[in-house]
Amino acid sequence: MLVVPTVCLASGDEHDPSQPKIFLRGDIYYANLEPHLGSEQGGIRPVVVVQNNTANCYSPNLIVAPVTSNTAKKPDHQAHVLVDGNRAFLQPSMILAKSVQTISKGRLIRPMGRLSIPELIRLNYALLYQLDLNEWVWRKEAYERYLRYHR
């Protein structure tokens, strides 16, 4: 279910704060990821918004997954999502769920498009894998076991 805040007063456009700007989970933007350190993804590249829509509305930051056109490197990695055929990309690309990061909305350059529902579902599974959420999100008994041993 897609829940979109009806009013997004906290995140107006930086050039015209009276115009609300709504960022949605699954949106694709060009972003400036410089400066970066070490093996962090850097440069001006596409990113996919993975943060929930309520936080997208009220936070000055976004949680994003960077995208690369280097689809040959570890194409079968469970935290990589191949996107082929999405009009936002000029060539097949890979969403790097293993490299999610928090960025300021000011790093966004321009919108590129949106993920399709099947692409977003594949990204959800990649994030569940990367963040090791499968057991905790989908299994109530695991949470109850955690509570028993960590009180």
Predicted stretch roles:
Residues S39-I44, V49-G85:
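Compact nucleic-acid interaction/catalytic patches
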